[in-house]
Amino acid sequence: MEKKLSSENNQLSSENILGLLPHRYPFALVDKVIENIPGERAVAVKNVTINEPQFQGHFPERPLMPGVLIVESMAQVGGIIVTQMQNLPKGLFVFAGINNVKFRKPVVPGDQLIISCDLLSIKRQRFGKVKGEAHVDGKLVCSGELMFSLVD
């Protein structure tokens, strides 16, 4: 699939995202990118709905989005940045680590996560690091540094 951007603010549709990332249901956790500076920064939207499978067990009486899925959403936005870098070898970049992750508020069905990631570094064209933040209604709900590695 060709990596096309929409004309407005370098946004990416869900179809564009599927062309950049290997994730599919139920792990496609980015609905659209609303700001995209390839290789530098991305801001994305994840709409949290009660229909998502994790809410059957986490928790039926009080559904909360698992923190690991918030972090995975941030990692996918970071992956969008890294996969668009022209000077890197082609291949699969995988989530390789996290530092300083903090969860500040619960995320529940009906929330809209606004996820921003900024590239911090690329080393030896194989390892990347981004700073990620997730907000709901303008309030920070999660932040941390995420690392990626190119798999041969």
Curated annotation (Swiss-Prot):
Swiss-Prot/TrEMBL catalytic activity: a (3R)-hydroxyacyl-[ACP] = a (2E)-enoyl-[ACP] + H2O
Classification via InterPro entries: FabA_FabZ, FabZ, HotDog_dom_sf
A GO CC annotation given for this chain: cytoplasm
Residue pairs linked by disulfide bridges in the UniProt entry: none
KW Lipid metabolism (keyword) present: yes
CDD domains listed in its UniProt record: FabZ (cd01288)
Enzyme Commission numbers on file: 4.2.1.59
Keywords assigned: Cytoplasm, Lipid A biosynthesis, Lipid biosynthesis, Lipid metabolism, Lyase
Catalytic class of the enzyme: lyase
Active site residues according to the UniProt entry: 58
Matching Pfam families: FabA (PF07977)
Residues making up the signal peptide according to the UniProt record: none
Subcellular location: Cytoplasm
Single Gene Ontology MF annotation: (3R)-hydroxyacyl-[acyl-carrier-protein] dehydratase activity
GO term, biological process aspect, one: fatty acid biosynthetic process
Protein family per UniProt: Belongs to the thioester dehydratase family. FabZ subfamily.
Function recorded in the entry: Involved in unsaturated fatty acids biosynthesis. Catalyzes the dehydration of short chain beta-hydroxyacyl-ACPs and long chain saturated and unsaturated beta-hydroxyacyl-ACPs.
Protein name per Swiss-Prot or TrEMBL: 3-hydroxyacyl-[acyl-carrier-protein] dehydratase FabZ
Source organism (scientific name): Prochlorococcus marinus (strain AS9601)
